[in-house]
Amino acid sequence: LGTQMKATGEVMSICTNFEGALMKAIRSLEQHVDCLMSYDFSYMNDDELEDMLRQVDDRRIWVIAEALRRGVAARHIHEVTKVDLWFIDKLEILIEMENALKEAGRKIRSGMPVELAFPEELLREAKRIEYPDTVISRLTHIPQDEIKRMRYSGGIRAAYKMVDTCAAEFAAATPYYYSCFGSENEAEATHDRKKVLVLGSGPIRIGQGIEFDFCSVHSTWAFKKEGYETIIINNNPETVSTDFDIADKLYFEPLTPEDVESIVDIEKPD
């Protein structure tokens, strides 16, 4: 602790696999980061990188990712950082996908047809572990609109699962959803009332705190009074807006254009 003001906000993400949940959490931070390449440590030599590995700060996950790119053994990273090997193995899976997408981009630039260099199976797996279209586009050099078209033509769309709030101890149905790819959609869109979709304010930061969540909650209540079906998208576990009984439906998702658009496509709010 010191005299410098620091934010204490947090994000929460849910997915059917850890890799996907981590990718969602990274882009939920809303700090111009969207993947494990968002901080560049490639300019460091190996000794400098190892010194960075020993430092505990908010960039450590990106430092570990750079070490994995350089072929540093997971066991050595564990010994230096004391991060459990299970988590390092999961980061390695994300780095392997990053390398596969970069290789597809190299093949495309060398003249190989896109459908051969970037098969649908690779796109499907990238989306399963929640690589956003923006990152896939950046790594493969395929325009983002074309990535989206390829996804839709292959039926690769986000599906929404209901959160089991009782850990399967007994049946529980709550209107509380998270996205994943490759599963059956459980968020049935209703059309008996007009709908309004409220975007939450995401993680608490310096200058953005509970007063913004107050606005989200009270606007939701106001629309409810007017007879609207209310839907909230947010990713902050500390807030009132992510209580599952505030709105008719809650989507626990990042607030990026792609994530929001996927929900809009299903719900079609007025």
Task: Go through each PLM region and give its residues.
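ATP-dependent carboxylate/acyl-activation modules
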Residues: 1-270
